[in-house]
């Protein structure tokens, strides 16, 4: 082995295998492009994006880590969302959750009160 050498398996690695996924239609109703990162809690995405936010709660984009989806003004397309894993706690972002996603009260500001469609 050469120092620093990587020895990889010949089989391909499948990201997010076995994770529950849904497809949602998303439309950018705004006048500016919107980008959403790979691990952003999708339900809290920019208010100009029109989609079923209740269905997106606790989910993120099913895209490679470190990448983003870009929605141009008037752009409408389908996205695949998977469940957030780990402790399932969300803090900051748009202040809609600020705590655990599962169980307990949800003290954050509802998306509709932040101007979301």
From Swiss-Prot:
SUPFAM superfamilies recorded: Urease, beta-subunit
Family membership noted in the UniProt record: Belongs to the urease beta subunit family.
S-S pairs: none
Main location group: cytoplasm
EC numbers for this chain: 3.5.1.5
Pfam assignment, any one: Urease_beta
Gene Ontology biological-process entries: urea catabolic process
One Gene Ontology MF term: urease activity
Pathway recorded for this protein: Nitrogen metabolism; urea degradation; CO(2) and NH(3) from urea (urease route): step 1/1
Highest taxon in the source lineage: Bacteria
InterPro entries recorded: Urease_beta-like (IPR002019), Urease_betasu_sf (IPR036461), Urease_subunit (IPR050069)
Subunit comment: Heterotrimer of UreA (gamma), UreB (beta) and UreC (alpha) subunits. Three heterotrimers associate to form the active enzyme.
Cellular component annotations (GO), alphabetically ordered: urease complex
Keyword Transport assigned: no
NCBIfam families attached to this UniProt entry: PRK13203.1, urease_beta
Protein name: Urease subunit beta
EC supergroup of this enzyme: hydrolase
Record localization: Cytoplasm
Region (Disordered): 95-117
This protein's record includes keyword Cytoplasm: yes
Keywords: Cytoplasm, Hydrolase
Reaction equation(s) it catalyzes: urea + 2 H2O + H(+) = hydrogencarbonate + 2 NH4(+)
